[in-house]
Amino acid sequence: MTRVTYIIYRIVYGLVKLFYPKTEVLGAEKLPADACIIVANHAKMNGPIVGQLYYPRKRLIWCAAQMQKLREVPAYAYQDFWSGKPGAVRWLYKLLSYIIAPLSVCIFNNADVIPVYHDSRVINTFRQTVKALEEGTDIIIFPEKLEKENPILYAFQENFVDVAKLYYKRTGKRVAFVPMYLAPALRQAHIGKPVSFDPDTPIREERTRICRQLHDAITDIAESLPLHTVVPYENMPKRCYPKNRGEA
């Protein structure tokens, strides 16, 4: 981090806050007193933006480590954001993925994030996460993967639950996972009831149980809200975006 990149980041931050719709976070009274892990739908870039701008407590957000590396941004950004675009314009988005790389590196190396790795370096992700929790900082995770489970929410990558095991080993405390549903169309984020980690249950079973309960809770929150368009995890034309439930 340099002073110049930090100044650029603050300018971008200010512009995003100026033009991005103000989002109301509802249900904050359900948050536990201790630091917790928020698990939410990604909703494209809406999830990280809302987490950074409007989450009511001190927090760090898990982000793909590739977004902090100049050489790795283009391939990751194209695949994650634009690979579903029509073939005739994909070349334009491939070019755009290179253009945004320097800005991405600037933003994600200055924002309140923890880089997430998918190799042996993941232990660094876990250690930073546990340290943050010990210091009273909430963690926000968007664990969806490209495996459709229902119209609202894709299936979860489950290994993030292992952080709770390491946290318990270090502190003797049971961290709570808290579901949150982001509804950009309503300009709202809704927090649900916490799900507590059980250190006495085998970790494989805990991964499944916690992810299932969180997934169901987020889906239930979405379905309980007024009819609106859901921003899905998968890249697709906006005309294909689903509703949160069938119209009456």
Kindly give the residue locations of the regions a language model identified.
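Flexible, charged surface loops at secondary-structure boundaries
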Residues: 29-34, 55, 132-134
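Catalytic core of membrane glycerolipid acyltransferases/transacylases, capturing the structured
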Residues: 34-118
